[in-house]
Amino acid sequence: MIIKLSLINIEFLKRMRYRDFEKKRKILECLKKNQNQAKQLRNHLWQLKVSKNNKSRLTKQVDRCCLTGRTKAYIKNFNLSRHAANLHAFEGLLQNTKTKSW
């Protein structure tokens, strides 16, 4: 199996970026919802938030297989792709699976 380390590293950096901007994003959301400020100011703050933090959103993060780096057919319970989980289940290496039975 080929491990896609560069893609895994990119996903790790995206998660770190999200964690860094999470506090700023929450502060801006609170400022936008604050009814004491003028509506124009709230909208301006919201536009700043949207324009600067596009790359750090939670939806930009993709779950990847920890062995192969594959994104498609990802099984969340095992953190593996379908192919890797199938091989490990056949060998009996997965928890709570005696044999490949699915």
From Swiss-Prot:
SUPFAM superfamilies: Glucocorticoid receptor-like (DNA-binding domain). It is found in: Mitochondrion. It holds the Pfam family Ribosomal_S14. The keyword Flavoprotein does not apply. GO terms for cellular component: mitochondrion; ribonucleoprotein complex; ribosome. GO terms for biological process: translation. Transmembrane segments: none annotated. PROSITE patterns: RIBOSOMAL_S14. GO terms for molecular function: structural constituent of ribosome. Keywords: Mitochondrion, Ribonucleoprotein, Ribosomal protein. Disulfide bonds: none annotated. The keyword Methyltransferase does not apply. Signal peptide: none annotated. Belongs to the universal ribosomal protein uS14 family. This is Small ribosomal subunit protein uS14m. The lineage of its organism: Eukaryota, Sar, Alveolata, Ciliophora, Intramacronucleata. The gene is RPS14.
